[in-house]
Amino acid sequence: MKKMMILSALALFSSSLFAANLTLQKEITPQIVNGEGVTLQEVHNGNRIELKPGHNQIAVTIGQIVFEDGKRRKFDSQPLLLEFVAKPEQALTLEYGKFRTIDDAKKFENNPTVHLTDAQGNPVAFTMVQLYKGGLQGFRDYEREVADYNAQKAQKADSAPLVNHDPKAMDLKTAFKEMTRQEQQAFMQWAMQNLK
Protein backbone atom coordinates (compact mmCIF):
# COMPACT_ATOMS: atom_id res chain seq x y z
CA MET A 1 0.00 0.00 0.00
CA LYS A 2 2.84 2.35 0.87
CA LYS A 3 4.57 1.64 -2.47
CA MET A 4 1.31 2.33 -4.32
CA MET A 5 0.97 5.75 -2.67
CA ILE A 6 4.59 6.61 -3.43
CA LEU A 7 4.18 5.57 -7.08
CA SER A 8 0.97 7.60 -7.38
CA ALA A 9 2.64 10.68 -5.91
CA LEU A 10 5.67 10.20 -8.16
CA ALA A 11 3.48 9.86 -11.27
CA LEU A 12 1.56 13.01 -10.36
CA PHE A 13 4.76 14.94 -9.69
CA SER A 14 6.52 13.75 -12.86
CA SER A 15 3.61 14.70 -15.12
CA SER A 16 3.81 18.33 -14.01
CA LEU A 17 7.62 18.20 -13.93
CA PHE A 18 7.88 17.60 -17.69
CA ALA A 19 4.90 19.76 -18.64
CA ALA A 20 5.27 22.52 -21.18
CA ASN A 21 4.09 26.02 -20.25
CA LEU A 22 2.08 28.36 -22.45
CA THR A 23 1.99 32.03 -21.47
CA LEU A 24 -0.92 33.92 -23.00
CA GLN A 25 -1.06 37.63 -23.72
CA LYS A 26 -3.26 39.33 -21.09
CA GLU A 27 -6.33 39.66 -23.35
CA ILE A 28 -6.23 36.01 -24.52
CA THR A 29 -8.45 33.66 -22.52
CA PRO A 30 -8.00 29.88 -22.73
CA GLN A 31 -11.38 28.18 -23.09
CA ILE A 32 -10.48 24.57 -23.94
CA VAL A 33 -7.24 22.63 -23.56
CA ASN A 34 -7.15 19.18 -25.18
CA GLY A 35 -10.93 18.79 -25.13
CA GLU A 36 -11.43 19.91 -21.52
CA GLY A 37 -12.78 23.22 -20.25
CA VAL A 38 -10.24 25.41 -18.46
CA THR A 39 -10.92 26.38 -14.85
CA LEU A 40 -9.48 29.40 -13.04
CA GLN A 41 -7.32 27.06 -10.94
CA GLU A 42 -5.58 25.85 -14.10
CA VAL A 43 -4.56 29.36 -15.17
CA HIS A 44 -1.48 30.36 -13.20
CA ASN A 45 -0.15 33.83 -12.49
CA GLY A 46 0.86 35.66 -15.61
CA ASN A 47 -1.95 33.98 -17.58
CA ARG A 48 0.08 30.76 -17.91
CA ILE A 49 -1.25 27.22 -18.42
CA GLU A 50 0.49 23.86 -18.32
CA LEU A 51 0.38 21.62 -21.38
CA LYS A 52 1.28 18.00 -21.82
CA PRO A 53 4.32 17.29 -23.96
CA GLY A 54 3.33 16.30 -27.50
CA HIS A 55 0.27 17.25 -29.55
CA ASN A 56 -1.95 19.92 -27.99
CA GLN A 57 -5.18 21.52 -29.07
CA ILE A 58 -6.35 24.73 -27.40
CA ALA A 59 -9.30 27.02 -28.01
CA VAL A 60 -8.83 30.65 -27.01
CA THR A 61 -10.84 33.85 -27.24
CA ILE A 62 -9.61 37.41 -27.25
CA GLY A 63 -11.40 40.09 -25.26
CA GLN A 64 -10.16 43.65 -25.62
CA ILE A 65 -11.49 47.17 -25.08
CA VAL A 66 -11.61 49.11 -28.37
CA PHE A 67 -12.91 52.51 -29.46
CA GLU A 68 -16.05 52.89 -31.56
CA ASP A 69 -17.29 56.40 -32.38
CA GLY A 70 -15.25 57.83 -29.50
CA LYS A 71 -16.72 55.39 -26.98
CA ARG A 72 -15.09 52.41 -25.36
CA ARG A 73 -16.50 49.00 -26.21
CA LYS A 74 -15.52 45.43 -25.40
CA PHE A 75 -14.65 43.27 -28.39
CA ASP A 76 -14.86 39.49 -27.95
CA SER A 77 -13.47 37.33 -30.74
CA GLN A 78 -14.80 34.09 -32.09
CA PRO A 79 -12.88 31.14 -30.61
CA LEU A 80 -9.58 30.31 -32.30
CA LEU A 81 -8.62 26.63 -32.25
CA LEU A 82 -4.87 26.03 -32.39
CA GLU A 83 -3.00 22.74 -32.73
CA PHE A 84 0.73 22.38 -32.16
CA VAL A 85 3.37 20.13 -30.65
CA ALA A 86 4.95 21.09 -27.32
CA LYS A 87 8.26 19.65 -26.17
CA PRO A 88 8.78 18.62 -22.52
CA GLU A 89 9.51 21.63 -20.30
CA GLN A 90 9.18 23.99 -23.29
CA ALA A 91 8.13 27.58 -22.56
CA LEU A 92 5.79 28.95 -25.22
CA THR A 93 4.10 32.33 -25.67
CA LEU A 94 0.90 33.11 -27.59
CA GLU A 95 0.40 36.73 -28.68
CA TYR A 96 -1.49 38.85 -31.19
CA GLY A 97 -1.17 42.43 -32.42
CA LYS A 98 -3.42 44.61 -30.25
CA PHE A 99 -6.05 46.73 -31.95
CA ARG A 100 -7.33 50.17 -30.97
CA THR A 101 -10.56 50.61 -32.93
CA ILE A 102 -13.54 48.43 -33.75
CA ASP A 103 -12.40 48.53 -37.39
CA ASP A 104 -9.06 46.98 -36.37
CA ALA A 105 -10.97 44.33 -34.42
CA LYS A 106 -13.21 43.55 -37.41
CA LYS A 107 -10.14 43.15 -39.64
CA PHE A 108 -8.74 40.73 -37.08
CA GLU A 109 -12.05 38.85 -36.98
CA ASN A 110 -11.96 38.45 -40.78
CA ASN A 111 -8.31 37.36 -40.82
CA PRO A 112 -7.12 36.41 -37.32
CA THR A 113 -3.36 36.35 -36.84
CA VAL A 114 -1.61 35.13 -33.71
CA HIS A 115 2.03 34.32 -33.00
CA LEU A 116 3.24 31.24 -31.13
CA THR A 117 6.89 31.46 -30.09
CA ASP A 118 9.34 29.58 -27.90
CA ALA A 119 11.45 31.06 -25.09
CA GLN A 120 14.05 32.33 -27.58
CA GLY A 121 11.39 34.11 -29.65
CA ASN A 122 11.54 31.58 -32.48
CA PRO A 123 8.22 30.85 -34.22
CA VAL A 124 6.60 27.50 -33.42
CA ALA A 125 4.61 25.77 -36.19
CA PHE A 126 0.87 25.51 -35.57
CA THR A 127 -2.44 25.23 -37.38
CA MET A 128 -5.40 27.45 -36.59
CA VAL A 129 -9.08 27.58 -37.45
CA GLN A 130 -11.73 30.01 -36.33
CA LEU A 131 -14.87 28.42 -34.87
CA TYR A 132 -17.56 30.73 -36.18
CA LYS A 133 -21.08 30.63 -34.79
CA GLY A 134 -23.65 33.06 -36.15
CA GLY A 135 -26.66 34.52 -34.39
CA LEU A 136 -27.03 35.38 -30.73
CA GLN A 137 -24.12 34.13 -28.69
CA GLY A 138 -25.05 34.74 -25.07
CA PHE A 139 -23.68 31.53 -23.64
CA ARG A 140 -21.45 29.29 -25.73
CA ASP A 141 -20.56 25.68 -25.07
CA TYR A 142 -16.93 25.71 -26.20
CA GLU A 143 -16.39 22.06 -25.27
CA ARG A 144 -19.28 21.02 -27.54
CA GLU A 145 -18.08 23.25 -30.38
CA VAL A 146 -14.55 21.80 -30.24
CA ALA A 147 -15.92 18.24 -29.99
CA ASP A 148 -18.20 18.87 -32.99
CA TYR A 149 -15.30 20.33 -34.96
CA ASN A 150 -13.08 17.34 -34.17
CA ALA A 151 -15.86 14.90 -35.13
CA GLN A 152 -16.46 16.74 -38.39
CA LYS A 153 -12.70 16.83 -39.07
CA ALA A 154 -12.47 13.08 -38.49
CA GLN A 155 -15.32 12.48 -40.96
CA LYS A 156 -13.84 14.71 -43.64
CA ALA A 157 -10.19 13.76 -43.84
CA ASP A 158 -9.91 15.44 -47.24
CA SER A 159 -11.63 18.71 -46.26
CA ALA A 160 -10.10 22.13 -46.89
CA PRO A 161 -6.59 22.48 -45.48
CA LEU A 162 -6.02 24.34 -42.24
CA VAL A 163 -4.06 27.57 -42.25
CA ASN A 164 -0.44 26.55 -41.88
CA HIS A 165 1.76 28.89 -39.86
CA ASP A 166 5.06 27.09 -40.43
CA PRO A 167 7.55 29.88 -41.12
CA LYS A 168 9.51 27.81 -43.67
CA ALA A 169 6.36 26.99 -45.63
CA MET A 170 5.30 30.64 -45.58
CA ASP A 171 8.73 31.71 -46.92
CA LEU A 172 8.50 29.16 -49.72
CA LYS A 173 4.97 30.27 -50.66
CA THR A 174 6.03 33.91 -50.71
CA ALA A 175 9.09 33.17 -52.83
CA PHE A 176 6.99 31.13 -55.28
CA LYS A 177 4.44 33.95 -55.66
CA GLU A 178 7.22 36.43 -56.42
CA MET A 179 8.64 34.28 -59.26
CA THR A 180 7.87 34.97 -62.91
CA ARG A 181 5.74 32.46 -64.79
CA GLN A 182 8.83 30.90 -66.39
CA GLU A 183 10.60 30.64 -63.02
CA GLN A 184 7.51 29.01 -61.50
CA GLN A 185 7.38 26.45 -64.32
CA ALA A 186 11.09 25.66 -63.95
CA PHE A 187 10.65 25.30 -60.20
CA MET A 188 7.65 22.98 -60.65
CA GLN A 189 9.60 20.78 -63.07
CA TRP A 190 12.48 20.58 -60.60
CA ALA A 191 10.08 19.80 -57.73
CA MET A 192 8.35 17.01 -59.69
CA GLN A 193 11.71 15.43 -60.58
CA ASN A 194 12.84 15.52 -56.95
CA LEU A 195 9.71 14.15 -55.24
CA LYS A 196 10.50 11.66 -52.52
UniProtKB/Swiss-Prot annotation:
InterPro entries, A to Z: UPF0319
Keyword ATP-binding attributed: no
Signal sequence segment: 1-19
Highest taxon in the source lineage: Bacteria
Statement: the UniProt record of this protein carries the keyword Signal: yes
Pfam families per record: DUF2057 (PF09829)
Keyword entries, A-Z: Signal
Disulfide bonds: none
PANTHER family on file: UPF0319 PROTEIN YCCT
Family recorded in the similarity comment: Belongs to the UPF0319 family.
Name of the molecule in the record: UPF0319 protein VV0948
Organism whose genome encodes this protein: Vibrio vulnificus (strain YJ016)
